[in-house]
Regions:
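Acidic, serine/threonine-rich low-complexity disordered tracts
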Residues: 20-98, 147-264
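Extracytoplasmic beta-rich ectodomain segments of secreted or membrane-anchored proteins
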Residues: 121-165
Length: 264
């Protein structure tokens, strides 16, 4: 076969493969434009069980509304209104950079404060938690992510495996499974002490966190989270003021779903 014909044949095969497996950007990169609106609702349940103590359980939840103000190839600016029920609501202009890895807020005095986005879930795909996906998504494929920083539902030096459960090119929908493990305290809402009840008496115990394990499904539609659930368990050691200790299992169940705009 002549080189020109061979090149044409290879290009044709590459085009066919690309058509069969569209770019991962279609599924996992948001295609925002100014004027679009989104909302989600969310909750996190936390429970701690230790022998000899009453189980402690608490839950918080709320909703958030997003109005896209501007968008570029690797970032976007949104007005974000959010509320955890029972707490004060927030209303801020937030810029997401680096395809969602970094968020920046305009503080009083006109100064911008930027931080890594380390939430367990959110409006969009976040490569800090999910890793950089392959150029093309195929059902059954997987990749590994090193989550070095502690985040909302995991400790530091974590490792996570992401598996493509299914893709639907007709709706630009991808379902991913994430499963991982880490060590130590989480980045937020993770107190170093806990109060548990024993024989009718409340006792304050020091928390020494061990290994966490998480697993859950997330559905993305054009890069936006449509539904997300994650179950996290961690083995802790609780130490009393007298120095005695007891093993404990801590569990968190996170749920986030897209909702009709607005919720607030």
């Amino acid at each position: 076969m002549k080189s020109s014909l061979l090149a044409a044949s290879l290009m044709s095969l590459a085009g066919a493969a690309s058509a069969d497996h569209p770019s991962g950007d279609r599924y996992l990169t948001p295609q925002f434009s100014a004027g679009q609106n989104y909302s989600n609702v969310f909750s996190i349940l936390r429970s701690i069980k230790a022998d000899g103590y009453d189980e402690h359980a608490s839950r918080n939840g709320g909703s958030a509304d997003y109005s896209i103000l501007s968008a570029s190839n690797d970032g976007w600016v949104t007005r974000a209104k959010g509320r955890y029920d029972g707490q004060a609501s927030g209303d801020d202009s937030v810029e997401f950079r680096d395809n969602g890895r970094t968020y920046c807020q305009l503080n009083a005095g006109g100064k911008t404060s930027c931080n890594a986005y380390l939430e367990g879930s959110g409006l969009t795909y976040n490569a800090t938690i999910w890793g950089v996906p392959p150029k093309q998504l195929v059902q059954g494929m997987s990749w590994t992510v090193d989550v070095k920083q502690a985040w909302e539902l995991g400790g530091s030096n974590g490792t996570e495996k992401v598996t493509v459960v299914s893709v639907d090119a007709a709706t630009d929908t991808a379902i991913l499974l994430r499963e991982g493990a880490s060590e130590g305290f989480y980045s937020e809402s993770d107190a170093h002490t806990v109060q548990l009840t024993h024989d009718g008496h409340t006792e304050t115990l020091e928390v020494k966190p061990g290994t966490s394990h998480w697993k859950g499904y997330t559905t993305f539609v054009k890069g936006v989270v449509f539904s997300d659930e994650l179950v996290v368990t961690r083995q802790d050691l609780l130490v009393s003021k007298s120095g005695s200790s007891v093993n404990a299992t801590e569990r968190r169940v996170m749920l986030l779903n897209a909702a009709p705009f607005p919720t607030l």
